[in-house]
Amino acid sequence: MAQSEVNSVCVASDRAGDTGDQSDDSSDGSLFKTQCAPSPIQKQRHPTVKRVTLPASVETDSSSDSSIEPRPLTLKAIFERFKKKKRKKRKKRKYEPKLRPRGRPRGKPSGTRITRRSQIDAKQIKDKGAVFPFLESESGRKPLPWKKILTYEQAVARGFFHHIEKLKYEHHLKECLKQMHAGEDLEKEDLDSRRHKYMDDDGSLSPIEEPLTEDEATNPQAECDIKLVEDSCFIISSEFSRKRNLEQEKIKKESTFSKKAKDATHREKGHRRTLKGNEHVTIEEDSRPQPRPFAHLQSKVMKKGELEYLEVHHLCGLSQPL
């Protein structure tokens, strides 16, 4: 292919050279004839064929894929491959300012303040919903505040749902009585009385009376658990607590008197109690009066002989001179 393309290019260049020579001859022969400008030669663009040269290692690998067994992946190989990978840098996002207004809105005076009351229409203020005339007379205010109206509306809704629940129980009980073929006189009673009659802690009780056995007929009060008792059995008398308080006060007084008597006896004997660790230890004291220190300084101005006499007596342990 390449040789044929080169040959065609050579032929085209020869033809162009011949035409150029002929034009030169004609121009030399006839000077007065108008000369035609030669048209530019259009060179053929050679299509570049890109050959992808595969490395020898790839060719050998492709040929020897069937012979070589696949290597088992290990953690070390996975980590090395992850480290060699070039991580793409994230593009830094430019700050795009939001179109929210900042600061105080313009066109409004600084003193004005938007309140919730200003947003409520006049019709909403007039029509407060449910009216409670008996509550208005008790509270003394004709237009009740919003908080009270909300609490009363909630109470009304609660009572309504309780009434629906009661009606549902009644309807269910009537259906059960019809299935049990109970009398019509039982259906005429109120729900509360029927509830206590047919329900018990252990389970549901049948409204149909069961026939009594022979033992129950002979001894009707044998298995009776209910007994009428006076009210005094249930009320605890307060005399017991008073007596108990008086006894406690007496015991306290006796203990205080005994402590005082012991302290007085210890003082008379001249004993003194001291703490030795965590135990009280009694120490006997001398009943004799101890000499006062510096007694000679308290006396008035004396003669030298009297002072010497007092000092001698003081050193001997005598409080007063003989």
Curated annotation (Swiss-Prot):
Comp. bias regions, Basic and acidic residues: 257-267
GO biological process, one term: regulation of DNA-templated transcription
One cellular component term from this protein's GO annotations in UniProt: nucleoplasm
Modified residues (Phosphoserine): 23, 137, 232
Comp. bias (Basic residues): 82-107
Pfam families: TAF1D
Region (Disordered) location: 1-70, 82-116, 198-219, 257-276
GO MF term (any one): DNA binding
Matches recorded under InterPro entries: TAF1D (IPR027976)
Location in or out of the cell: Nucleus
Keyword Phosphoprotein belongs to the record: yes
Keyword set, alphabetical order: DNA-binding, Nucleus, Phosphoprotein, Transcription, Transcription regulation
Protein's job: Component of the transcription factor SL1/TIF-IB complex, which is involved in the assembly of the PIC (preinitiation complex) during RNA polymerase I-dependent transcription. The rate of PIC formation probably is primarily dependent on the rate of association of SL1/TIF-IB with the rDNA promoter. SL1/TIF-IB is involved in stabilization of nucleolar transcription factor 1/UBTF on rDNA. Formation of SL1/TIF-IB excludes the association of TBP with TFIID subunits.
Quaternary structure, from the entry: Component of the transcription factor SL1/TIF-IB complex, composed of TBP and at least TAF1A, TAF1B, TAF1C and TAF1D. Interacts with UBTF.
Protein name stated in the entry: TATA box-binding protein-associated factor RNA polymerase I subunit D
Protein's organism: Mus musculus
Gene from which this protein is expressed: Taf1d
